[in-house]
Amino acid sequence: MTSRASELSPGRSVTAGIIIVGDEILKGHTQDTNTFFLCRTLRSLGVQVCRVSVAPDEVATIAAEVTSFSNRFTHVLTAGGIGPTHDDVTFEAVAQAFGDELKPHPELEAATKALGGEGWEKLSLVPSSACLHYGTDPRTGHPFRFPLVSVRNVYLFPSIPELLRRVLEGMKGLFQNPAVQFHSKELYVAADEASIAPILAEAQAHFGRRLGLGSYPDWGSNYYQVKLTLDSRGRRIPGGNAWPNLTARLPQGSLVPYMPNAVEQASEAVYKLAESGSSLGKKVAGALQTIETALAQYSLTQLCVGFNGGKDCTALLHLFHAAVQRKLPDVPNPLQILYIRSISPFPELEQFLQDTIKRYNLQMLEAEGSMKQALGELQARHPQLEAVLMGTRRTDPYSCSLCPFSPTDPGWPAFMRINPLLDWTYRDIWDFLRQLFVPYCILYDRGYTSLGSRENTVRDPALKRLSPGGHPTYRPAYLLENEEEERNSRT
């Protein structure tokens, strides 16, 4: 079937409206991730998404949205409300929107029978004017077993994110607009948004319709305060004096060469640093050698990283992740971390822990109590574990005599302690994290230099400063001048 987008005249805008269907979204029971994927993919296909709507599981409401969107946009994509249950009403709503009847479709009847089981018959009842699109499953290279249903310019996608993504990937030809290609550029600025607002307004007035300039503050980033996005349609980001003038007017030193994909690109960046020959690079190379030795001696199921959200174990986790990316790229096992929960953890640290688990795709092994108690619990619950990678440095208490591979002491649960960072300094840790734009706990940007629980951790007095108004403020931990004052945060 010829796609509607391919029939358009060259240069004509192709637009889309997205309707997300589901009471579970409106009630907060389920987090919608489909919108982000649909918008990003459609834009990559030259399609401008103009509106997103979330509708409840109500036939009349969905039908009204479909009618409105169908008249206004080239394509309408719905997600959700397709299934065997009473609240799956999208087919019925679309039929109502176009004055169609619901009728069983022979091909869908055959497809539902192939699914096996009972209760799937409802999926074969579609609007009488429906078209079926089989596409190619990107995972198998074969046509989808169950087709995508469309009615006029409305395409009815499933709500399951993994399935929706596969279907859209296999149906790109329905929406591809070769006449238009969107180009974008991102800038990261370490300056308050209000302070650069006049500069941005003047730049947008100068660019006019050639360029869309967006400004998005980020209060949770360790590296920038504002992300600027510059978008153009059908051409690359304009050159000439416009672009240099914008960057030149931003506060001096505020542009950050930020890498938003630091975790995905960890292997390339970490090994490049290790091979640089710099002082830090040599420390990285030594740590990687220890980690690679561990990977040669133990499987991933026998290893875990001791992780409490601190700066040292964050650097260690990134190194370990990079080494696994390089040495074991095809091993599906997630990396394991051991988290020993304190009695009163910082909420910010707990949030960072959850973000890190998602960011690195980790499996968390949780324990409580002292280190000795936690290792005993770990051994009892996960007997396959044999070694724990630790972010210990020689300057830590009771650590000056450790070796890269140190068995636990007699009387302790038997584990091999692997210490890749023994010879690293406080400055080495921060240089590594900051140079590679590794995300770390936001508390370090608020004056804490060493993290424990809320009961034994305070801001480091060495970082305290007075603001112009006379109020006390704290510089970030990476600006600590005397490394011997690192543990001033612990009481």
Swiss-Prot record:
The keyword Lipid metabolism does not apply. It is found in: Cytoplasm. The modification N6-succinyllysine is found at K282. GO terms for biological process: FAD biosynthetic process. It is an enzyme of class 2 (transferase). Transmembrane segments: none annotated. It comes from the Eukaryota. It catalyses: FMN + ATP + H(+) = FAD + diphosphate. One of its GO terms (cellular component) is cytoplasm. Residues 461-491 are annotated as: Disordered. The molybdenum cofactor biosynthesis protein-like region may not be functional. In the N-terminal section; belongs to the MoaB/Mog family. This is FAD synthase.
